[in-house]
From Swiss-Prot:
Listed InterPro entries: Ribosomal_uL3, Ribosomal_uL3_bac/org-type, Ribosomal_uL3_CS, Transl_B-barrel_sf
GO cellular component: cytosolic large ribosomal subunit
GO biological process, one term: translation
Family to which the UniProt record says this protein belongs: Belongs to the universal ribosomal protein uL3 family.
Protein name: Large ribosomal subunit protein uL3
Residue span of region Disordered: 125-151
Superkingdom per UniProt: Bacteria
UniProt KW keywords: Ribonucleoprotein, Ribosomal protein, RNA-binding, rRNA-binding
A GO molecular-function annotation: structural constituent of ribosome
Lineage: Bacteria, Bacillati, Bacillota, Bacilli, Bacillales
Record organism: Bacillus anthracis
UniProt keyword annotation of Iron-sulfur present: no
Quaternary organization: Part of the 50S ribosomal subunit. Forms a cluster with proteins L14 and L19.
Physiological role: One of the primary rRNA binding proteins, it binds directly near the 3'-end of the 23S rRNA, where it nucleates assembly of the 50S subunit.
Length: 210
């Protein structure tokens, strides 16, 4: 069974382990989530729970949103996501999910929206190598051959310049260094996708190494 929680990335800091090792960590504020809906194999074809995070003003919501959250006896939520293969039987609609679902040392996957970089060339966007910068070369930071003679067309998937970032990214197998139940904080080893204050999903690792 998978477990998860929604939160907001606060930023990065460092903590000392018991052996004196300095560990870089990302601080995630995961205030209590509310179970808005339960999905089962019988009714929806798969098992999942729908979580809501952070209240939203009713003025900014429509009638379907208000009705959906009213069934869980809660206010409209800003961030709503599903946690697949969750323990559907162990949770009820309207129940709160807190940071104590995770423990120190557990391995998790964190999903967020990567930082937007704007329009970038192929070297920054795809990691291509640049051409010679001297000796008469006129090829420096270009995308490379477009096949103008043969095959006389541009192949699908050709790596070109374009808008970079703003994609959904999941970083797998991150260790939880500390769980602060008083302040609803998770300290995760390493970095996670997104800018400060961006919304993230923390789930139990899918491909944890044994």
């Amino acid at each position: 069974m998978t477990k998860g929680i929604l939160g907001r990335k606060i930023g990065m800091t460092q903590v000392f382990a018991e052996n004196g090792e300095l560990i870089p960590v990302t601080v995630i504020a995961a205030n209590p989530n509310v179970v808005l809906q339960k999905k089962t194999t019988e009714t929806d074809g798969y098992n999942a729970i729908q979580l809501g995070f952070e209240d939203k003003r009713e003025k900014l919501t429509n009638k379907p949103e208000q009705g959906h959250t009213a069934k869980a006896s809660t206010t409209p939520k800003r961030f709503i996501r599903e946690i697949r293969d969750a323990d559907v039987d162990g949770l009820e609609v309207g129940q709160e999910v807190k940071v104590d679902v995770f423990a120190t040392g557990e391995i998790v996957d964190v999903t967020g929206i990567s930082k937007g970089k704007g329009f970038q060339g192929v070297i920054k966007r795809h990691g291509q190598s640049r051409g010679p910068m001297s000796h008469g070369s006129r090829y420096h930071r270009r995308p490379g051959s477009m096949g103008p003679v043969a095959p006389n067309r541009v192949f699908k998937g050709k790596k070109l310049a374009g808008r970079m970032g703003g994609d959904q990214v999941t970083i797998q197998n991150l260790e939880i260094v500390q769980v602060d139940t008083e302040r609803n904080l998770l300290l995760v080893k390493g970095n996670v996708p997104g800018a400060k204050k961006s919304l993230v999903v923390v789930q139990g690792a899918v491909k944890v190494s044994k």
